[in-house]
Amino acid sequence: FPYTTLFRSHMGKRFVFPHNDMEGLRKQLQRATALADKQNGGVLVITEGVFGMPGDLGKLDEIVAMKRDFKFRLLVDDAHGFGTMGKTGAGTGEHLGVQDQIDVFFATFAKSMAGIGAFVATEEEIIAYLKYNMRSQIFAKSLPMPMVFGALKRLELLKTKPQYKAKLWEITRALQNGLRKNGFNIGNTNS
């Protein structure tokens, strides 16, 4: 997701919280909410479903729980979770039981789907705004039809062949265990 483009193009204030630090997020939400209330604005929390480099999961369930105390929208970039996490492969939100509480869901077809392109799942109004206002989309073309058909077929396989995802996890665990056994430090990945 082109975060830098998003940050440069918006007129609001940006608050950053440390990686997966929920107390840090809470403090920033207090600051952001106070400012948003004063300026009649809104708050958008951006995180990842699976953090690509360390491989740990975003604490989406804990972030969603904060919606009881703060008013904000949640954008999840789940490039590494879509197709691999959750019962149906819908992503990390599904895996953690909060997929329906994610306001803006972004993922790519380039990772688990072995294709090109990406998608945003959200309200129609937001999609229309992004489509016609994001610099990266103004002169963009639609995906080539063979790539669309390929993505649709892979989505169908995700739904109808759960054994493929199970095999992926079997191979993943074998690789992780083999690397650890041979002295490689692969961190504390849970993906």
Where are these predicted regions, by residue range?
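Short, structured coil segments at secondary-structure junctions
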Residues: 9-11, 101
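Active-site phosphate-binding strand-loop segment of PLP-dependent enzymes
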Residues: 15, 19-76
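Short beta-strand
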Residues: 17, 43, 106, 140-141, ...
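Conserved active-site segment immediately N-terminal to the catalytic lysine
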Residues: 70-71, 91-109, 128, 132
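Conserved core segment of the aminotransferase class I/II
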Residues: 104-106, 113-162
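Conserved PLP-dependent catalytic core of the aminotransferase class-I/II
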Residues: 58, 145, 152-191
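Short, small-residue-biased leader/transition segments that mark boundaries at the very start
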Residues: 2-6
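Helix C-cap/helix->beta junction micro-motif
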Residues: 10, 69-70, 182
